[in-house]
């Protein structure tokens, strides 16, 4: 028997391309409006959902650590980061984390408002049958600040990092959702 094989459906389960960064997406139909595109990205996006664990046996003499019955999830850190190549006042306000827009002026605020937390989506192509992988960040807040990197004879870049948040009303809800659709709906 040879062990250097791959599953016969491997190429049907690949995520393809850079995907699109959105403000809204409808996973039941696999659709979005052009106006929902947050901005053009360069280099795709990076997503991580990392749990923090506690072990109830930790700190107890003679207790065995890493028993599955004593392991608990303390919290989740959910982040999405990347680089935008396009910007407008709406996305600039969002990148600030806390801000307001007045015509063409974007002002940073010293306090957070509930409207500073927004839902964001990343959606990428999946397989060869029109499928998608979608990641929904719930109550996302820009935690990477506002950054611009200009370049001689090139386009400017706006690095971003968003962190998803639970809320007091739903403290046990992990603030992201993952959808994998083979057919696009």
What are these regions (language model features)?
Residues 79-83, 119-123, 159-163:
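Beta-strand secondary-structure signal
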């Amino acid at each position: 028997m040879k062990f250097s094989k791959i599953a016969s459906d491997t190429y049907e389960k690949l995520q393809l391309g850079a995907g699109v960064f959105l403000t809204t997406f409808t996973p039941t139909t696999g659709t979005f409006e052009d106006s929902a595109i947050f901005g053009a990205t360069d280099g795709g996006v990076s997503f991580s959902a990392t749990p923090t664990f506690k072990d109830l046996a930790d700190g107890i003499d003679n207790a065995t650590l890493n028993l599955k019955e004593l392991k608990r999830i303390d919290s989740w850190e959910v982040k999405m980061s990347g680089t935008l190549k396009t910007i407008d006042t709406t996305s600039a306000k969002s990148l600030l984390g806390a801000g307001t827009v007045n015509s063409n002026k974007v002002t940073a605020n010293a306090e957070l408002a509930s409207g500073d937390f927004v839902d964001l989506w990343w959606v990428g192509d999946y397989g060869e049958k029109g499928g998608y992988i979608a990641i929904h960040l719930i109550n996302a807040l820009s935690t990477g600040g506002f950054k611009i990197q200009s370049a001689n004879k090139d386009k400017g870049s706006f690095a971003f990092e968003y962190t998803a948040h639970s809320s007091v009303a739903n403290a046990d809800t992990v603030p992201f959702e993952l959808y994998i659709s083979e057919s696009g709906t």
